[in-house]
Every structure is written in structure tokens, then in C-alpha cells.
């Protein structure tokens, strides 16, 4: 196990970001207080069964979410993580649960979308992934196999396996610092990342608007808006 102290500068960082980061840019959080996901029950729009049952509803829902990305901009937290990506000389992996493109637009490159991306599509006929057209409801042809009517959002729906898990697990085992930003601490497997990293000797830090369900697993917690906390923390790391 790695021997670390609080004052040590990290050599390998894994960062997990969730809906709280994008919420400050105006992206709706995953689920409202009424339990609905932008007016829909989750099982209506975010499961493979929903897509088989009513593909038009699902495609319209994601087309609207994709179009909404054009109305939002990266915030100070995205920009700070982009700066960290550019200037941090050690190992870095930013893992996001968010399906928007605000991290990319904020400058992040060492980035993995574990729940997929709104701006990507996947062909259910041949499996090819591609840039999503402006709308999927029109049933465009796959750019790889040219079959029509088989493109779905390249999003991890409930009951499906998150992307990049082997790479994420390896990074968590190597990390000497794990940071969780804007997450609920309730959705697995991401909610278990802190224990994996800690179990391999990493220091752990939570930055969240309010304490998450897993705050007690972290060595340190800072609570407040991500747009304030993250730039200050990045300055500490790079100083």
C-alpha cells in the first residue's frame, strides 16, 4: 500500500464528476424532487426495454437533450479541470457520469464518459459508434453499415454496463489521490470508487454542494458550489 500524507503532492489523480458540476451551467440534474427525469419516468426513456417499446419517445427525448446542449456553456469548474489536464505533469484521469460535452469544451482531454455521450450514437445492427446526427428520430443511416433505423443514443441505460470500467479500475488502483465532484454518492459502480482508491492507499477528497450519501468514506470533504471549490483546489495542486 502506498504511504501518503495529506501534504504530499499527488503523482496520479483520478477525478469523478457528476451532475452537480454541469448543474451550474444550467444542465438539468438527473432527477427532480418528484422523481421524474425531465417530466418522464426513468423506465419510459432510459432503459433498453423503453427503446424497444416506444423508440420514438426515447429518440425524441434524447434529441431534445442533445439540442439543449447548444444553450449551455462550460462553467468555472469545467475550465479549472481543463487547466489541470493541460498543466498537471502526472497521471490524470477524469471520469464523468455526465453525458454532456462541457468537459471537452472546458479543455479536458484525459477524459472518459462512463455513462456515454449525447453527441454520440451507436448502431444496434453493426455496433459501430459514430457522431450523432442532429436528430435520431428521422432514422438516419449508420455511417458504417448504412442500415437505416438502427441508431440509438450511445448512452448507458439502466441495466447496462458502464463504459471504460477496466481502465477506470486500473487508474483507481494506481491513484494516490481520488476526488469526487458533484456526485450523489448513491449510484453504483461510481459510488464505490472512493473505497477502491482508498483501499489501494489513495487520499480521498469530496467536493459537493452538500454532503453526499458517501461523505463519511472520504478523508476530506469541502462543501459549496463546484465553480468556486474546483478552481481553488486546482490552484493548490498546481502551485
Residue ranges of model-derived segments:
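Conserved catalytic core of sirtuin-type NAD+-dependent deacylases
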Residues: 1-239
Amino acid at each position: 500500500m502506498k504511504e501518503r500524507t495529506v501534504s504530499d503532492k499527488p503523482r496520479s489523480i483520478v477525478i469523478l464528476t457528476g451532475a452537480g458540476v454541469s448543474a451550474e451551467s444550467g444542465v438539468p440534474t438527473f432527477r427532480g424532487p418528484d422523481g421524474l427525469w425531465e417530466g418522464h419516468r426513468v423506465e419510459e426513456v432510459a432503459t433498453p426495454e423503453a427503446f424497444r417499446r416506444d423508440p420514438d419517445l426515447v429518440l425524441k427525448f434524447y434529441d431534445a437533450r442533445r439540442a439543449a446542449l447548444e444553450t449551455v456553456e462550460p462553467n468555472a469548474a469545467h475550465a479549472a479541470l481543463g487547466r489541470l489536464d493541460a498543466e498537471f505533469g502526472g497521471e490524470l484521469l477524469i471520469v464523468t457520469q455526465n453525458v454532456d460535452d462541457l468537459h471537452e469544451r472546458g479543455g479536458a482531454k484525459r477524459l472518459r464518459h462512463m455513462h456515454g455521450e449525447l453527441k454520440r450514437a451507436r448502431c444496434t445492427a453493426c455496433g459501430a459508434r459514430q457522431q450523432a446526427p442532429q436528430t435520431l428520430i428521422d432514422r438516419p443511416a449508420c455511417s458504417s453499415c448504412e442500415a437505416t433505423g438502427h441508431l440509438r443514443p450511445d448512452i448507458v441505460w439502466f441495466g447496462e454496463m458502464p463504459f471504460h470500467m477496466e481502465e477506470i479500475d486500473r487508474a483507481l488502483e494506481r491513484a494516490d489521490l481520488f476526488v469526487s465532484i458533484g456526485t450523489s454518492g448513491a449510484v453504483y459502480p461510481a459510488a464505490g470508487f472512493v473505497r477502491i482508491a482508498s483501499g489501494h492507499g489513495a487520499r480521498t477528497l469530496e467536493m459537493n454542494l452538500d454532503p453526499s450519501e458517501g461523505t463519511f468514506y472520504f478523508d476530506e470533504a469541502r462543501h459549496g458550489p463546484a465553480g468556486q471549490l474546483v478552481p481553488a483546489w486546482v490552484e493548490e495542486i498546481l502551485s
